[in-house]
């Protein structure tokens, strides 16, 4: 399959994501974002893809939903409250099949309770870009290769009180996009960490209804920048992300329960600024540095970038005022919103739905999600389906359409001699 156009788009997006001229006129072929605006691009965007069918069926929410084996991606602090002693989960998604037919993402997760208050967990995420045919000058065939990226995570989660828990996680990320075909390219690596908090307790807000209120906060992928080019010192940010939100679960009766969740997300990565250009459209440099007209220089370290990301949006040029305005408005548009609902019958069958919204200027992803699942004995099987409500690609279709995800879980209530979760009403 000839996919040279695809390769160039992916390579340019990932390898030069933080290029000075960040106003790309294309579609992000990993996340499906519209890049025609001032979108924040990072290396390894596959780290932001929801891996499991449960949360992806609920509008990509998960920071405060009830704990499961896939909590590593959403909020590792939830593991401290997981009820099962040992869990294994395997998730798979054929990714962006409207663009290519062999891109996919797989996810393996394990969790083990080590005490009534503590749980350890690990996960492996693997993203394959499929088979890509590389060509050189005069369309010389350089061979077919399979670029891939992967990450491995470990976490320790502990209850800090009757209703609250915390977690820290470590992560190693590896990205090999060119398989050594290009002389100046190399695989990129990063080491990152997560910190997270989770709170959950029974509440008595409704007559004759048992309810559980939860909230969570997680900052993920706090780590080193990545470099794909041996001939350059330019490095790209990884997708450091802030996720927070609440969940309310209602036990309607002994057989029926309903939960509602909301997630807010913000990339803690600098927004590309607006640079001064000359009459030819080239960026103007002063003392070796590009001249920033609005916003802030995004060539900074990871920690400074996290702090700066809350107040560095360049805004929009107002020709009547002759200056850039709306900086706070643009900053608020960098938050995405996920809303989800989950219904369970007899703790055996479930249906889920949700909605995800991203501002037009920041990627323009908007979609409905649906899903269902079954739980029998120690086994669980879930599936989700994504329906875009807008078209972002120039072809008039959305690269995310018809996205399916599948998850299989095995939950063992008792494994070894460890005691069960310490429960408090």
Question: Language-model segments: what does each one mean?
Answer:
Residues 23-425:
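Subset of outer-membrane beta-barrel
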Residues 1-25:
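Bacterial Sec-dependent N-terminal signal peptides
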